[in-house]
């Protein structure tokens, strides 16, 4: 799972961090996993007004995965991206991504803390190339302090991969002889799933590359749901019936209510069905990214989805969900430490993105500890003000 991300000079992000990076991890030595400060958690909500960077954050991480699956040049023009130079804020500087993970070691079962760093520069012709890649490991010493060691570095001066557009991680991560940390980071990013069930325009089934027959996993827009159900049915009629009964029992008055819903909500039961099916995949994704999963869902369906997302993260402690929303209902039962507020001052010349954790605001924490739900706190305007920022110790860091 992702503990933190830093993005520099890419899209709307000049130098912005969400969560915890490896260089700051030493301050949390000795604390329990549930209480180790302001970091991304198993369930995370991105909130804020329109055009504040929530969708851009998800798109930026989609770009990282696409760079690994294909290469940095193709990633810059697929998924409606406008080309690499148009993704840079400062055309004379590279963009950089730093992503800090907590990953389960498949052999020992223990947590590994690893950071992947990717720097992409532009040639004189504006085409992207890999300037530097690193994998760092955070290791606890006998005295309890943390040692940060470099597992791998691939720079333009000492490249192992001849194609400068291809990431070394995408090659070495598939080799059994590579360092285990490299394979773990690759598998973690390769397991990201960018869910578009609630997208305003879904891809056509065949143009999305689907084929008839049984499919093990849902695709990004859920258009192959029938194929996935065929696969589950092939495993055994009893297993199929059990899954269908469980999911259908969670969808409120599925057939009755649908007749009386407004037109834009009549697809809600099917949309909720896809989410519930995704969350029951026996081989869960490492991180599921969803933009506005509550879009067009009836309010009681939002409650069902929120409960099931929570249950997913409890059942899969090394997986996580990161979603954006404008709906207070879906965050009502969440913790302030699971909510990230994006803001921008459009009256300022640089209209820079600012990201803060709701759990770093002592006023919000006090309200939450008194029993006020996060949806009510948000509806009351306590999350949108953004007039001051606090660190986890309650120190005001506003400039």
Cite the ranges covered by each PLM segment.
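Electropositive, glycine-dotted interaction segments
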Residues: 107-250
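Short glycine-/polar-rich loops that comprise or flank the Walker A/P-loop
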Residues: 95-97, 190-191, 335-338
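Conserved P-loop NTP-binding catalytic core
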Residues: 39-43, 49, 56-123
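Short acidic, glycine-rich loop/turn motifs
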Residues: 7-9, 99-108, 137-139, 346
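Switch/communication elements of ASCE P-loop NTPase nucleotide-binding domains
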Residues: 1-67, 257-399
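Short polybasic amphipathic segments
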Residues: 5, 97-99, 127-139, 259-260, ...
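Hydrophobic residues positioned within well-ordered beta-strands of beta-sheet architectures
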Residues: 3, 16, 97-99, 114-116, ...
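Oxyanion-binding "anion nests"
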Residues: 253
């Amino acid at each position: 799972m992702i503990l933190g991300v830093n993005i520099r000079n890419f899209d709307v992000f000049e130098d912005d961090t969400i969560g915890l990076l490896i260089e700051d991890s030493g301050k949390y030595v000795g604390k329990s996993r549930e209480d180790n400060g302001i970091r991304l958690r198993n369930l995370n909500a991105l909130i804020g007004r329109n055009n504040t960077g929530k969708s851009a954050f998800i798109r930026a991480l989609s770009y990282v995965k696409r760079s690994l699956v294909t290469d940095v040049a193709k990633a810059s023009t697929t998924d409606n991206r406008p080309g690499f130079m148009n993704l840079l804020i400062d055309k004379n500087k590279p963009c950089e991504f730093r992503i800090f993970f907590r990953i389960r070691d498949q052999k020992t079962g223990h947590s590994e803390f690893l950071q992947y760093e990717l720097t992409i520069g532009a040639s004189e012709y504006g085409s992207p190339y890999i300037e530097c890649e690193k994998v760092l490991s955070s290791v606890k010493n006998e005295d309890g302090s943390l040692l940060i060691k470099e597992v791998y570095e691939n720079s333009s001066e000492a490249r192992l991969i001849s194609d400068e557009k291809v990431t070394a991680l995408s090659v070495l991560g598939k080799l059994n002889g590579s360092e285990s940390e490299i394979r773990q980071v690759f598998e973690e990013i390769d397991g990201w799933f960018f869910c578009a069930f609630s997208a305003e325009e879904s891809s056509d089934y065949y143009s999305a590359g689907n084929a008839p027959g049984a499919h093990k996993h849902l695709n990004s827009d859920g258009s192959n749901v029938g194929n996935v159900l065929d696969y589950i049915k092939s495993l055994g009629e009893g297993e199929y019936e059990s899954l269908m009964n469980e999911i259908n029992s969670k969808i409120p008055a599925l057939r009755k209510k649908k007749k009386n819903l407004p037109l834009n909500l009549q697809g809600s039961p099917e949309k909720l069905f896809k989410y519930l099916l995704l969350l029951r995949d026996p081989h869960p994704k490492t991180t599921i990214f969803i933009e506005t999963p509550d879009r067009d869902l009836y309010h009681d369906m939002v409650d069902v989805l929120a409960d099931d997302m929570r249950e997913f993260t409890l059942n899969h402690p090394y997986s996580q969900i990161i979603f954006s929303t404008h709906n207070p209902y879906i965050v009502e039962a969440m913790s302030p430490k699971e909510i990230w507020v994006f803001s921008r001052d459009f009256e300022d010349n640089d209209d820079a993105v600012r990201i803060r954790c709701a759990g770093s605001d002592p006023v919000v924490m006090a309200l939450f500890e008194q029993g006020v739900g996060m949806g009510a706190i948000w509806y009351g305007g306590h999350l949108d003000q953004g007039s001051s920022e606090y660190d986890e110790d309650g120190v005001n860091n506003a400039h």
